[in-house]
Amino acid sequence: MAYVNGTTNGHANGNGLDLCMKKEDPLNWGVAAEALTGSHLDEVKRMVAEYRKPVVKLEGETLTISQVAAISARDDSGVKVELSEEARAGVKASSDWVMDSMNKGTDSYGVTTGFGATSHRRTKQGGALQKELIRFLNAGIFGSGAEAGNNTLPHSATRAAMLVRINTLLQGYSGIRFEILEAITKFLNHNITPCLPLRGTITASGDLVPLSYIAGLLTGRPNSKAVGPTGVTLSPEEAFKLAGVEGGFFELQPKEGLALVNGTAVGSGMASMVLFEANILAVLAEVMSAIFAEVMQGKPEFTDHLTHKLKHHPGQIEAAAIMEHILDGSAYVKAAQKLHEMDPLQKPKQDRYALRTSPQWLGPQIEVIRSSTKMIEREINSVNDNPLIDVSRNKAIHGGNFQGSPIGVSMDNTRLAIAAIGKLMFAQFSELVNDFYNNGLPSNLSGGRNPSLDYGFKGAEIAMASYCSELQFLANPVTNHVQSAEQHNQDVNSLGLISSRKTSEAVEILKLMSTTFLVGLCQAIDLRHLEENLKSTVKNTVSQVAKRVLTMGVNGELHPSRFCEKDLLRVVDREYIFAYIDDPCSATYPLMQKLRETLVEHALNNGDKERNLSTSIFQKIAAFEDELKALLPKEVETARAALESGNPAIPNRIKECRSYPLYKFVREELGTEYLTGEKVRSPGEEFEKVFTAMSKGEIIDPLLECLESWNGAPLPIC
C-alpha cells in the first residue's frame, strides 16, 4: 500500500499516480512506518549500493543519507552532483514572489523586518538587510595556525551541509535564485569547500553561524576562505575562478541570505554521515558477536528463532537470525558440540550474557539506529527555513521548521545506541582475553612460546577500557543542556549540530573498539588453529609412548598397563593445551600431573598384580614419563614450526565458516600478523591497518560477503 500525505511543493504535482492506489496519510505516520519495512541488512545493502553511484541527482525530496555520505567522504573520487531542471521553475517562482511582494510593500519577516527578537524593526533596503545578516552571523572563531584546524568544521561535514542545503532550497519555498544553487553545486563538483567554524550554532534558528560562512564565500566577504582540491587555502576570488562560477560575487536579493542560513543542513548533514557508518558498524557488531561465539566454543542455541519470536522485537529477531546464519554449519560449532558432549560439566550449562544475550542487547540498538536514520532522512528532505514562500496561496508563512529537534533527539538516541554496542563489545573482548573465561585460549591471547615474555593483548585490553569509558561518557544527552539564546527569542533550541558532533566522536571510538576486537578475534581464530594442531601432536605422542612403554612387559608379554592408553588420551582431550604447552612435561603443569594421576589410579585398581614387578603398572610410570619428556617437547616444536611455515597438519577451520571473508580480509588483504612476543610488531601497528581500512569503507564488502547467502529469515523451527 502506498501512502500520500496530501502535500505538494506549492507548484504543479506531476507525479501522475492514481490516487485510487493510495491511502490517505495526512499525518505521515503511514509513510514513516512503511519506511521501516524489510530487513535492516537489506537496507544497509541498498545504502552501500547508493553510496557507490557516480552521480547524486538532487530533486528536493529524494535525498538519502548514503548520498550525503558519498558526497561528504568522496570528494576526490569523481562523484558529481546534478540539479533537477524540473525544480528550476519552482525555485524561480518563489524568488520572483519575494521580489514582487517587496515591490508591493508587503511586510515579510527577514525581507523587510529585522531578525529574531528585533524583528520589530523595518527597512525597505532588502539587499542591504541580507548583507548585514551575513555580516553579523560571521561570529565564529577559527584561531590561527595549528589552532585553526581544531576550530574548523571538518570539510566532509561542510560538503554534507552544502548538499543538504541545496536539496532543501530546490523545493521552491525559500525565495532564492537557482543560480546560487548552481554555484554551490559547482563548488562541490570542483572540490572547493568553504571554511566553517566548528562551534557556534544551536541549530535553531537553523545552523545560522556556520551556514553564514557559505553565504560569505558566495558574496565575496573578505574574511571568507575556502579549501581547494589540493588542500590549499583559497580566497573567494580564487574559489570562484577555480569552480568556474561566472558573473562575480552574488549581490543577495531580499530573503536570499535568510534562505541560505536559516536551515538545519549542517546538523543533518553531519548526522547523515554519522548514521551511514553507524548502520554498517551495527551489522559488523552482529557478525563479530557470531565470530565471538565461534572462538569461545559457545552453544548456538542462543540464536534459536523461537526464543526471539516470543520476544517480538524485530531488531532482536534479525540480529539473532544473522548470528544463526553465521553459526549454522560452522566448523567451530561442530567441534564445540563434541567437546560439550564429551564433558558437559567442564563449563557452565549456559554461556555468559555477553554471548548468550547479544541478540537481545543489539536488537534495540539497531532499531534505534534505523529509526534515527529515517528521521534524519526526512529532515534532509524537509523545507526547514522561515518564512516559507507559498506561491500557490500567495503568502509567506511564518513558522519554525528551522528547529532541529529531530537532529538533536535522533543523534542523542543514536549515541546511546552506539555506546551500548561498545559496552557489549568491551564485555566480549574482556572474556576473550581472560583465560578464566575463554575456554582454553591463552591469557591475553598471547601467541608465543613463552608466556612469561609475551603479554599479547594486555595493552589492547587497557585501551579498550579507555575507549569504552569515553564512549559511555559521550552517551550522556546533549539536548537537555539547552540555554535560552538571542534575547530569549530562541529560548528553546535543539543543539542538533552539537549532538551530531558528539555522535561523530562516538562513531570514531566505536571504530577503534571494533578494530581492536576484530584483530583480537582473528588472533583467537589463529590460536584455535594452533591449539588444534598442538593437541593432535600431544595426543599422537602420548599414544605412541603409551604403546611403546605400556603395552608389553619385560619379556614381551601383554602388560596390564596397556589399558591405560584410552584414559591417558582422555586427559589430553580435557586439558586446555595452553595451560601447559610452553613446558609440556613440567611436573607443575596439569598435563603431567593428570597423566600421572591416571596411571596411579590404574595401578591402585590393579590389585595383587602390583606386587609382581613384571605386571606392576606403578613400575611403568617413570619409564612412561621419561620417554614422554624425551619426545614431546621436540614434537611440539616441530608442530609449531610447521604451522608457522604454512604447512600445518590440520588446516584452519575458519575456511569452512561463513565468517571467513572477514578473517581473510584482515589477515590476507590487509596483511596483519599473528601477534607474539617473539616478533617486533606491536598490536597497535596491526590495529592501524584495520582502522584505516574501516575508515575508508573497505571492510564493507567482506562484511556483506559473510551474509551474502542469508535469505533474510531465521532458520525454520523444527
Curated annotation (Swiss-Prot):
The active site is at Y109. The keyword Oxidoreductase does not apply. Belongs to the PAL/histidase family. GO terms for biological process: cinnamic acid biosynthetic process; L-phenylalanine catabolic process. This is a key enzyme of plant metabolism catalyzing the first reaction in the biosynthesis from L-phenylalanine of a wide variety of natural products based on the phenylpropane skeleton. Pathway: Phenylpropanoid metabolism; trans-cinnamate biosynthesis; trans-cinnamate from L-phenylalanine: step 1/1. PROSITE patterns: PAL_HISTIDASE. It catalyses: L-phenylalanine = (E)-cinnamate + NH4(+). It comes from the Eukaryota. The modification 2,3-didehydroalanine (Ser) is found at S205. Contains an active site 4-methylidene-imidazol-5-one (MIO), which is formed autocatalytically by cyclization and dehydration of residues Ala-Ser-Gly. One of its GO terms (cellular component) is cytoplasm. (E)-cinnamate binds at N262, Q350, R356, N386, K458, E486, N489. The lineage of its organism: Eukaryota, Viridiplantae, Streptophyta, Embryophyta, Tracheophyta. Homotetramer. The keyword Amino-acid biosynthesis does not apply. Keywords: Cytoplasm, Lyase, Phenylalanine catabolism, Phenylpropanoid metabolism. There is a cross-link at A204-G206 (5-imidazolinone (Ala-Gly)). It is found in: Cytoplasm. Its EC number is 4.3.1.24. This is Phenylalanine ammonia-lyase 3. GO terms for molecular function: phenylalanine ammonia-lyase activity.
